[in-house]
Amino acid sequence: MTSVVVVGTQWGDEGKGKITDFLSADAEVIARYQGGDNAGHTIVIDGKKFKLHLIPSGIFFPQKISVIGNGVVVNPKSLVKELAYLHNEGVTTDNLRISDRAQVILPYHIQLDQLQEDAKGDNKIGTTIKGIGPAYMDKAARVGIRIADLLDKDIFAERLRINLAEKNRLFEKMYDSTPLDFDAIFEEYYAYGQEIKQYVTDTSVILNDALDAGKRVLFEGAQGVMLDIDQGTYPFVTSSNPVAGGVTIGSGVGPSKINKVVGVCKAYTSRVGDGPFPTELFDEVGERIREVGHEYGTTTGRPRRVGWFDSVVMRHSRRVSGITNLSLNSIDVLSGLDTVKICVAYDLDGKRIDYYPANLEQLKRCKPIYEELPGWQEDITGVRSLEELPENARNYVRRVGELVGVRISTFSVGPGREQTNILESVWASI
């Protein structure tokens, strides 16, 4: 068996879609294991950008199976829209498989998400208002509706009626909000279920059979480790587990079948939404990185917060996700800077620490300790090997690997497939 997990090591938007697309060339099955349409990934093929939110990046390889696993929360409306988008672009989706155990996002989840966020006022989390959190809440409360339920007219009607009655009481009594109509939701979403029915199956069987047959399986995470509900900057996190361990729960594949974990990061750091960000930049350098790196959310369109590379964050991600290989993206964005900085540790109340505090009040007091390196002025977007990089850029790449403590397998100097450079084949090393 041969399997590789791709995880984001920062706060999402690290370029996982691109690296997954790149690694998919040598995989036979590509599976997503958590999150929902709150995550966005951009793939560039022959200069054309494709933006996806639910469907795995592997969909662009028609001969390979693409899986939406049981750990994903699926908005059928968004999924049908994304399928239509791909079909209009001439992309076949016959290779898509959707877990019958995946949870369904319904309109009351989205309305509740908005109401809860508004009620928090200044303490808002910065949610994408996609209904992700409320859907996972229902899953944990054992009242969620699964894809298998959506396809059964009687079961869907019964469970929707019960859930909607409870949610409407909540909307009216607690939030003084408008109740939702059962008939409208039932008719619309049952129809969506029938549209996606052809793709639905027990995906754990597909994945385990593939691994047992010696096929190469690639698991694609959404968001990033620092948004993990257990290991991230709680409560400013998502509602699932992007860490590599989330694969086993979200796909139905046991931990003994995972071989490699590729951590994806940018040569700097970015974050969408609220929450701690020790190396955040508020000056013209930060603005320059944001504009050159096109740092605006794929899902929200919001400007991303940007900062220097944080090796404290990266070592935390390496530890909790068991990262074996590193993919360093967007090195080209730093071109033109006289100096570049890497955070090597924090100063907490006068004491140097090299771990990421769980206590947010302590984290607010952490000041980054930087190591400065000379920058480079050259345009590196056409570089196709480590040796072709300017010396200062090459030294930067090597220093990142040293500080994180993981060997760098690939580095990227732009968004295109051809701009990803291999230092070590992840598949060949298994």
From Swiss-Prot:
Q: Which GO terms describe its biological process?
A: 'de novo' AMP biosynthetic process; IMP metabolic process
Localization terms from the record: Cytoplasm
Q: Which residues bind substrate?
A: 298-304
Pathway(s) served: Purine metabolism; AMP biosynthesis via de novo pathway; AMP from IMP: step 1/2
Where does the record place the catalytic residues?
Answer: 13, 41
Quote the record's cofactor note: Binds 1 Mg(2+) ion per subunit.
Main subcellular localisation: cytoplasm
Q: What class of enzyme is it?
A: ligase
GO molecular function (one): adenylosuccinate synthase activity
Q: Name one GO cellular component term.
A: cytoplasm
Residues that bind IMP: 13-16, 38-41, 128, 142, 223, 238, 302
- Keyword flag Magnesium: yes
- Keywords tagged on the record: Cytoplasm, GTP-binding, Ligase, Magnesium, Metal-binding, Nucleotide-binding, Purine biosynthesis
Where, in this chain's numbering, is GTP bound?
A: 12-18, 40-42, 304, 330-332, 412-414
InterPro entries in the cross-refs: Adenylosuccin_syn_GTP-bd (IPR018220), Adenylosuccin_syn_Lys_AS (IPR033128), Adenylosuccinate_synth_dom1 (IPR042109), Adenylosuccinate_synth_dom2 (IPR042110), Adenylosuccinate_synth_dom3 (IPR042111), Adenylosuccinate_synthetase (IPR001114), P-loop_NTPase (IPR027417)
List the SMART domains. Adenylsucc_synt
Reaction(s) catalysed (UniProt annotation): IMP + L-aspartate + GTP = N(6)-(1,2-dicarboxyethyl)-AMP + GDP + phosphate + 2 H(+)
Q: What is its EC number?
A: 6.3.4.4
Cross-referenced PANTHER family: ADENYLOSUCCINATE SYNTHETASE
UniProt lists the family membership as follows: Belongs to the adenylosuccinate synthetase family.
Assembly description: Homodimer.
| HAMAP family according to UniProt | Adenylosucc_synth
Please give the function described in this protein's UniProt entry: Plays an important role in the de novo pathway of purine nucleotide biosynthesis. Catalyzes the first committed step in the biosynthesis of AMP from IMP.
Name of this protein: Adenylosuccinate synthetase
The gene for this chain is: purA
